[in-house]
A protein has these predicted regions:
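Charged, amphipathic alpha-helical linker segments immediately N-terminal to NTP-binding catalytic cores
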Residues: 1-20
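A conserved segment at the C-terminal end of the G1
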Residues: 44-48, 56-73
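ATP-dependent carboxylate-amine ligase catalytic core
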Residues: 6, 20, 26, 30-34, ...
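Beta-strand->loop->alpha-helix junctions that form or flank phosphate-binding loops
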Residues: 75, 193-196, 206-225, 246-249, ...
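Conserved catalytic-core segment of NTP-binding enzymes
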Residues: 143-147, 152-212
Length: 307
């Protein structure tokens, strides 16, 4: 059994542990997760997939729940500067010590099961979150959905932010095939939120086939921009005077709207005031996403690899 004194030591070893950098499938991660967590206990869970907008939706959810005072864990990838950014509790990256302790626990139970770098990280986040008395955990899919390691956890809400052409070697070359892969996060009798304005029919059909409760933007929920604010609507619920999203771009109204619906759908278990929603939307930030760096010369930084 391997053990290392530093986070760098663990990460260097993990990069060489598995023969493939990307190896989709749930069997390996699920086997180790069962050994780590035989009772299957977990916090309330929102899983977010999508070609673009996953990280933004996670950011809105995290900040809304934190504004209400809940204890929130968020898992996302990749990191910008430091590995710890992937695993946050209450908006702060967890320590090297916590990550290394989780790595050691995983190593102690994995036996001869080979894990990819991403699978190790996903299991680490889940293990840390399970031990942290969270009110809710927010999980960002790494690639696709159906066979992504995040999908070993059954979500209480599944959210798909958008469908575009990406990772065609693994997900297929059409929006239809990619949508089917991402729809793998849907569960029976569980809300499935779609933030894409023109979702492929295959995505809608997958929701029906899985008996998920489908909510589509511009049909089941929508937003309306005012002069300096915007309003959100779903059924009989109306949230007025929302501030401009902290993340910039017209598409961020869709992402924020999808996140708000997720919050509203979980309101019986985790009530959130409209004031907290307003504050969370306003305060959301994301490293490397239209990030304005104010120095002597203003710099706009964006690391998104899709248009």
């Amino acid at each position: 059994m391997m053990n290392f004194d530093s986070l760098k030591g663990w990460l260097d070893w993990q990069e060489s542990l598995h023969p493939l950098a990307i190896d989709l499938g749930l069997v390996r991660a699920a086997r180790v997760y069962q050994a780590l967590n035989p009772d299957g206990n977990k916090p309330l869970t929102i899983t977010v997939a999508g070609t673009n907008g996953k990280g933004s939706c996670i950011a809105y959810l995290e900040n809304i729940y934190r504004a209400e005072g809940y204890r929130v864990g968020s898992y996302s990838s990749p990191h910008i500067l430091k590995y710890n950014e992937r695993i946050k509790i209450d908006g702060k990256p967890v320590s090297d010590e916590l990550i290394c302790q989780a790595f050691a626990r995983i190593e102690s139970v994995r036996g001869d099961t080979s894990l990819s770098y991403f699978e190790f990280g996903t299991l680490t986040a889940l293990d840390i979150f399970r031990r942290s008395e969270l009110d809710i955990q927010l999980l960002e899919v790494g690639l696709g959905g159906r066979l992504d390691a995040v999908n070993i956890v059954d979500p209480d809400i599944a959210l798909i932010s958008s469908i575009g052409i990406d990772h065609v070697d693994w997900l297929g070359a059409t929006r239809s095939s990619i949508a089917q892969e991402k729809a793998g996060i849907f569960r029976a009798n569980t809300p499935a939120i779609i933030g894409d304005c023109e979702p492929p029919l295959s995505l809608l059909q997958c929701a029906v086939d899985k008996s998920a409760h489908l909510f589509c933007i511009n049909k089941d929920f929508h937003y309306q921009k005012q002069t300096t604010t915007w309003d959100w609507f779903s059924g009989n619920t109306h949230i007025s005077d929302l501030p401009e999203p902290g993340l910039k771009g017209e598409h961020q109204y869709r992402n924020a709207s999808s996140a708000i619906l997720a919050v509203e759908l979980l309101a019986k278990k985790l009530p959130v005031s409209h004031d907290s929603i307003r504050l969370g939307v306003k305060n959301s930030q994301l490293l490397g996403r239209f990030q304005l760096i104010n120095d002597k010369i203003p710099v706009l930084l964006d690391v998104g690899h899709n248009p």
